From Swiss-Prot:
The protein's name: Large ribosomal subunit protein uL16
Family membership noted in the UniProt record: Belongs to the universal ribosomal protein uL16 family.
GO cellular component: cytosolic large ribosomal subunit
One Pfam family this sequence matches: Ribosomal_L16
Gene3D superfamilies: Ribosomal protein L10e/L16
Alphabetical list of InterPro entries matching this protein: Ribosomal_uL16, Ribosomal_uL16_CS_euk_arc, Ribosomal_uL16_dom, Ribosomal_uL16_euk_arch, Ribosomal_uL16_sf
GO biological process: translation
SUPFAM superfamilies the UniProt entry points to: Ribosomal protein L16p/L10e (SSF54686)
GO molecular function: structural constituent of ribosome
Record keywords, A-Z: Ribonucleoprotein, Ribosomal protein
Subunit annotation: Component of the small ribosomal subunit. Mature ribosomes consist of a small (40S) and a large (60S) subunit. The 40S subunit contains about 33 different proteins and 1 molecule of RNA (18S). The 60S subunit contains about 49 different proteins and 3 molecules of RNA (25S, 5.8S and 5S).
Length: 220
């Protein structure tokens, strides 16, 4: 018996059912890698960011997430270069899908109980996605902005329902806008922290501040 099509599980109808000690025998999700490309590049390397945003409330299978990751990574590697981007999958397939297998042979009514005790057994996993939730994000340099948008446009065909490609106003994957990031950096208040950045606060105990400085150090 083959895999049941994901269109049968597209709508969110029930409560979340994650893998646990009560829900055993769950197959591993197809997607195992969520960060692709130059994920170790600092926050200053890739200022541009674009998102693929879901426009419907639905279930997205782990197979669809893996297919979208592959096609987006392949296009960005071919067009922009393998060292010119960082792709991140922003949703995780924690919800367990179940199937109640039914026999279709002759005399099946003698062998099974139909819809009696029809809870079903785990078949696969999916991600529960809400309206406005980000599915994929790509950060890169400004000269590769068109390539990043095209890569996400191709990844849209791997998902059901509707999605939108939205250019972020933030600096990379951080929570700061471009103007604020450059302002804080010129003031010396930004401390790089991998793909994100920390903002030094201007409050705290006075004895921890260095003479002539208004902001605390990163270790304070």
């Amino acid at each position: 018996m083959g895999r049941r099509p994901a269109r049968c599980y597209r709508q969110i109808k029930n409560k979340p059912c994650p893998k646990s000690r009560y829900c055993r025998g769950v197959p591993d999700p197809k997607i195992r890698i969520y960060d692709v490309g130059m994920k170790r590049k600092g926050v200053d390397e890739f200022p541009y960011c674009v998102h693929l945003v879901s426009w419907e409330r639905e279930n997205v299978s782990s197979e669809a997430l893996e297919a979208a990751r592959i096609v987006c990574n392949k296009y960005m590697t071919k067009s922009a270069g393998k060292d010119a981007f960082h792709l991140r999958v922003r949703v995780h397939p924690f919800h367990v899908l179940r199937i109640n297998k039914m026999l279709s042979c002759a005399g099946a009514d003698r062998l099974q109980t139909g819809m009696r005790g029809a809870f079903g057994k785990p078949q696969g996993t999916c991600a529960r996605v809400d309206i406005g939730q980000v599915l994929l994000s790509v950060r890169c340099k400004d000269n590769n902005a068109a390539h990043a948008s095209e890569a996400l446009r191709r990844a849209k065909f791997k998902f059901p329902a509707r999605q939108k490609i939205i250019e972020s106003r933030k600096w990379g994957f951080t929570k700061f806008s471009r103007a604020d990031y450059l302002k804080y950096k010129s003031e010396g208040r930004i401390v790089p922290d991998g793909v994100n950045a920390k903002l030094l606060a201007n409050h705290g105990r006075l004895e921890k501040r260095a003479p002539g400085k208004a902001f605390l150090d990163a270790v304070a």
